[in-house]
Design a protein with these regions (language model features):
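Mature, function-bearing regions of proteins
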Residues: 1-289
Length: 289
């Protein structure tokens, strides 16, 4: 079982967003809490955590087999990343029951409907969207998530899962966390499909930094992975000094961010210039042709 490693309490800066969150109900106000966390408090951390969450799902043989057979990662890894990012970001930024949120979920369901995916696999992917941001922030965020934020994250993705028609979603945070951990122990294992998808995803990330030596960049990516994930992809264990350096740099960043004033404007990923589309895209056009 992976345990959370809380950052020091001296990183707990006060912000108007945290004050607002502490006054909200994590069940009835979960849309607002997740929006504040994703777009104001932790935009960079949430993105990195969800990237790692998606990486973890590829270690599941049945998921990797579907993705590998589709050819999307081998030929269009960046487009696949941008499609996923824009759909999920729309749901978070607009809210799952807004017009755009409903369109995003409808498009996501249309894409998934082309493949034979087990309910348990859907449920694991959903659980990774809940727990990877929580784990990331506990290790590398400028503050860990408070209980209201953790419960709101669970409630938000619970509601998204219901709108995706995912069945048998655990009713509590603790039950979903237990499912997440038990599922990984039972299902993570090396396959050729997982290796191909993992390599394609790794190389996509490395392409973002063309001036960085590939060997060093790859080791930095491996340093963010635990042993079961490395084994599932057949990736080498990074040298201990590399892992220590990567973790130290992320903690240094956290301390620097903690000294900055709260963000004034939301960081909206749906407004950013994507590598695949620029800023010209429509929800209904995302996904495989």
């Amino acid at each position: 079982m992976r345990t959370l490693e809380p950052v020091s309490s001296d990183l707990m800066r006060e912000s108007q967003y945290l004050r607002e969150i502490m006054g909200l109900d994590p069940v009835t106000d979960h849309n607002r809490i997740v929006y504040l966390d994703t777009c104001f408090e932790f935009p960079w951390d949430t993105t990195r955590a969800l990237e790692l969450a998606l990486f973890r799902t590829f270690a599941v043989p049945s998921v990797a087999a579907v993705l590998d057979a589709s050819g999307e990662f081998d030929r269009r890894a960046q487009k696949r990343y941008d499609d996923t990012d824009l759909i999920l970001s729309t749901i978070v930024e607009a809210g799952y029951d807004s017009d755009d949120g409903k369109r995003a979920i409808r498009q996501m369901n249309r894409i998934h409907g082309r493949f034979e995916i087990a309910n348990e696999d859907f449920l694991y992917v959903l659980s990774s969207f809940v727990f990877e941001p929580i784990r990331w922030n506990a290790r590398f965020g400028w503050r860990p998530l408070v209980e209201a934020e953790r419960l709101a994250t669970f409630q938000f993705w619970l509601e998204v899962g219901r709108r995706m028609a995912i069945k048998e979603i655990p009713a509590t945070y603790e039950e979903l966390q237990r499912f997440n951990q038990e599922y990984e122990r039972a299902n993570f294992r090396p396959t050729e499909e997982a290796r191909r998808v993992g390599l394609a995803t790794r190389d996509m990330f490395l392409a973002w930094f063309p001036g960085l030596p590939k060997r060093f960049g790859a080791q930095a990516i491996y340093a963010l992975m635990d042993e079961p994930l490395l084994a599932a992809f057949g990736f080498p264990r990074p040298p201990r000094p590399v892992r220590a350096a990567v973790e130290a740099s992320l903690r240094t960043r956290a301390r620097a961010v903690a000294l900055l004033p709260p963000r004034r404007n939301p960081r909206l990923r749906t407004r950013r210039k994507t590598r695949s589309y620029g800023q010209d895209w429509q929800l209904e056009e995302l996904g495989p042709a």
